[in-house]
Amino acid sequence: MSSIGGKLQKSLHKIRAGALGIPLPKHIQEVSIQYSLDSRLGHMGAKKFVKECLPSLYYNNYGLKFNVNHRLPNDQTPTFSIISNNKVIYSYDMRSKQLETISSDIQKALKELHHESSPENIKEAHKQDYSPPSN
């Protein structure tokens, strides 16, 4: 195998099986990321996150809307948000954090979100909410 083919294969595998290669639940409408291209004032981790981790999340959630705004003023906080039913259900402040911290924190939140919306947990939640009619 040529070295170019091997490098390409490694890159594609990294995207498919990356740390954020997590399929999101169907009720999620949008993933929104806002950061500045200027890496001063705590935007460097967010910038690296978009370049290195976001492709994996996008690959595993192809039909989902991804809104990436890299024109945020440098004095504002870079954020990662998940939107469902036109409401932000998860927001993460990425200011002054390193890539590894951002990636692991978001990975934990996505797994928790995925676990909360699994069919077993939804059925269990409906059982808890149901109260039989009183006679």
Curated annotation (Swiss-Prot):
<comment type="function">
    <text>Component of the mitochondrial ribosome (mitoribosome), a dedicated translation machinery responsible for the synthesis of mitochondrial genome-encoded proteins, including at least some of the essential transmembrane subunits of the mitochondrial respiratory chain. The mitoribosomes are attached to the mitochondrial inner membrane and translation products are cotranslationally integrated into the membrane. mL61 is not essential in cells grown at 30 degrees Celsius but is required for mitochondrial translation in cells grown at 18 degrees Celsius.</text>
</comment>
<keyword id="KW-0689">Ribosomal protein</keyword>
<dbReference type="GO" id="GO:0032543">
    <property type="term" value="P:mitochondrial translation"/>
</dbReference>
<dbReference type="GO" id="GO:0003735">
    <property type="term" value="F:structural constituent of ribosome"/>
</dbReference>
<feature type="compositionally biased region" description="Basic and acidic residues">
    <location>
        <begin position="114"/>
        <end position="129"/>
    </location>
</feature>
<comment type="similarity">
    <text>Belongs to the mitochondrion-specific ribosomal protein mL61 family.</text>
</comment>
<keyword id="KW-0496">Mitochondrion</keyword>
<protein>
    <recommendedName>
        <fullName>Large ribosomal subunit protein mL61</fullName>
    </recommendedName>
</protein>
<dbReference type="InterPro" id="IPR040049">
    <property type="entry name" value="Ribosomal_mS25/mL61"/>
</dbReference>
<keyword id="KW-0687">Ribonucleoprotein</keyword>
<comment type="subunit">
    <text>Component of the mitochondrial large ribosomal subunit (mt-LSU). Mature yeast 74S mitochondrial ribosomes consist of a small (37S) and a large (54S) subunit. The 37S small subunit contains a 15S ribosomal RNA (15S mt-rRNA) and at least 32 different proteins. The 54S large subunit contains a 21S rRNA (21S mt-rRNA) and at least 45 different proteins.</text>
</comment>
<dbReference type="GO" id="GO:0005762">
    <property type="term" value="C:mitochondrial large ribosomal subunit"/>
</dbReference>
<feature type="region of interest" description="Disordered">
    <location>
        <begin position="114"/>
        <end position="135"/>
    </location>
</feature>
